[in-house]
């Protein structure tokens, strides 16, 4: 379980009033903010901070890990004829933008091989 804490007493003066996320299971702390000596998001073993006292800070959201399986879907709403015409006459389609592997790209900036690959993968005869 993750607990938000504010350090109220420590041998290291820079730790006073700093905020951390404490992971009891891993015995680690993630720095939220500190005066000096620790960077934001730095993860340290609990033992590194030495003897400390703290007060718990309520967290609004409990972090969770969720694995979806790594699938994604690119949607291009175009006709095959439009892309084929863009290959033959790129000057007619200077603003044609498509989605490729999660990012947007101008169709005319792709190499001819990449353009053919997009057309082949986007328009199939059957599943």
Curated annotation (Swiss-Prot):
Top-level lineage group: Bacteria
- What does the UniProt keyword field contain? Organic radical
Source organism lineage? Bacteria, Pseudomonadati, Pseudomonadota, Gammaproteobacteria, Enterobacterales
Question: Pfam families annotated for this entry?
Answer: Gly_radical
Q: Which residues form a coiled coil?
A: none
Pinpoint the Glycine radical domain residues.
5-127
**Main role?**
Acts as a radical domain for damaged PFL and possibly other radical proteins.
The family database entries (InterPro entries) matched by this protein are listed as:
Auton_GlycylRad_Cofactor, Form_AcTrfase_GR_CS, Gly_radical, Glycyl_radical_cofactor_GrcA
PANTHER family this protein is in?
A: FORMATE ACETYLTRANSFERASE, FORMATE ACETYLTRANSFERASE 1
Which molecular function term from Gene Ontology is one that the record holds? formate C-acetyltransferase activity
Gene3D superfamilies on file: 3.20.70.20
**Residues bearing PTM Glycine radical:** 102
Q: What is this protein called?
A: Autonomous glycyl radical cofactor
Gene Ontology cellular component annotations, sorted alphabetically? cytosol
